[in-house]
């Protein structure tokens, strides 16, 4: 991979692909052993990070466990009322589930389980995740309550009565969506450069 220059051939090709798809895209790709060899498109722009927030959350959990500040075998019982919407994991179960924190982390990372991630975030605390981001040199990475914070904000920004209604509103091409819905300032967000550094 060659280091890119703004307006270079690779940049133009990727931007053209995004344009053809009718989307705006951001990118930061680098060789692991030679980070200066990279291709970037708006690498410092703040963007929603979706489930990628679970990576620094896992790192914060591991650091706290290693320091003896959290017991990875501590068991939590998650009632049906604790479920966070999502297509995988505990979100699709009907009965109370009891799991250790470390098993919740496995669920969170292996199937991107939103309910498990929310339970781990409550146990770890957002401040611990912020410290990890600072320690890893990720100055533009913010968690803002994880997926629950993002979903709550989506419902509020769309004026919908529920998450399902908010999702329907955002997915409807004939509905004008308030611009705050896509504002990374209030959601788990980062920059392509931070995310590449993290991964």
Give, region by region, the residue ranges found by the protein language model.
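Active-site SXXK
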Residues: 48-72, 76, 195
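Flexible glycine/proline-enriched surface loops and loop-helix/loop-strand junctions
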Residues: 40-43, 100-104, 111-116, 175-183
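Soluble non-cytosolic domains of exported or imported proteins
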Residues: 4, 8, 52, 95, ...
């Amino acid at each position: 991979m060659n280091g890119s220059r703004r307006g270079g051939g690779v940049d133009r090709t990727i931007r053209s692909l995004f344009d053809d798809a009718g989307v705006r895209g951001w990118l930061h790709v680098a060789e692991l052993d030679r980070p200066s060899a990279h291709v970037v498109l708006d690498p410092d722009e703040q963007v929603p990070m979706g489930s990628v927030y679970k990576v620094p959350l896992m790192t914060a959990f591991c650091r706290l466990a290693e320091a003896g500040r959290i017991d990875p075998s501590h068991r939590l019982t998650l009632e049906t009322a604790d479920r966070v919407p999502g297509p995988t994991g505990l979100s699709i179960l009907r009965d109370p589930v009891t799991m250790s924190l470390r098993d919740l982390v496995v669920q969170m990372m292996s199937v991107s389980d939103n309910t498990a991630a929310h339970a781990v975030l409550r146990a770890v605390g957002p401040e611990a995740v912020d410290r990890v981001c600072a320690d890893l040199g990720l100055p533009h990475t913010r968690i803002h309550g994880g997926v629950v914070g993002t979903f709550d904000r989506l419902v509020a920004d769309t004026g919908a009565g529920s998450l399902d209604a908010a999702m329907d509103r955002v997915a409807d091409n004939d509905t004008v969506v308030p611009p705050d819905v896509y504002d990374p300032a209030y959601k788990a967000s980062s920059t392509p450069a931070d995310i590449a550094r993290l991964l």
